[in-house]
From Swiss-Prot:
GO terms for biological process: regulation of transcription by RNA polymerase II. GO terms for molecular function: DNA-binding transcription factor activity; DNA-binding transcription factor activity, RNA polymerase II-specific; RNA polymerase II cis-regulatory region sequence-specific DNA binding; zinc ion binding. The lineage of its organism: Eukaryota, Metazoa, Chordata, Craniata, Vertebrata. It comes from Xenopus laevis (African clawed frog). The keyword DNA repair does not apply. It comes from the Eukaryota. This is Oocyte zinc finger protein XlCOF14.
Length: 139
């Protein structure tokens, strides 16, 4: 609760706004918006419209610095940090900073030694899913 006080009685998922809970309820009632290309369904029509751009290749948000284009504005906003040097994600162990959350999470494995991606064939562990996928080609 607290920041997300509106809770779905069907699945327990919580929302910060009552409107989002109402939209989410479409998932349980079957009142969703399916993609005609791939069949994936969405609780909100605007989410379907955003998804459909994946199939058209449309990337309407363009970086004014380098010209790179993005499907979603929030991805462009995060990309802008690569030009400013701002790194909002800090390691609590050593203070090293990162532009992307997933890079911080990968870095934190260097402190713990954790290798969460394990080969089902030989049991060898890897820090990333990509490293495991490369390894799996040897079997």
């Amino acid at each position: 609760t607290g920041k997300y006080p509106f809770i779905c009685s069907e699945c327990g998922k919580s929302f910060m706004d009552k409107r989002y809970l109402k939209i989410h309820s479409n998932v349980h009632s079957g009142n969703t918006f399916p993609c005609t290309e791939c069949g994936k369904s969405f609780a909100a029509k605007q989410n379907l419209k955003r998804h459909q751009k994946i199939h058209t290749g449309e990337k309407p948000h363009k970086c004014t610095e380098c010209g790179k284009q993005f499907l979603q504005k929030n991805k462009l906003d995060r990309h802008h940090l690569s030009h400013t040097g701002v790194k909002p994600f800090s390691c609590f162990e050593c203070g090293e900073q990162f532009t992307w959350k997933h890079l911080l999470q990968y870095h934190q494995l260097s402190h713990t030694g954790e290798r969460p991606f394990v080969c089902s064939e030989c049991g060898k562990g890897y820090k990333t899913k990509a490293s495991l996928a490369l390894h799996c080609h040897i079997h």
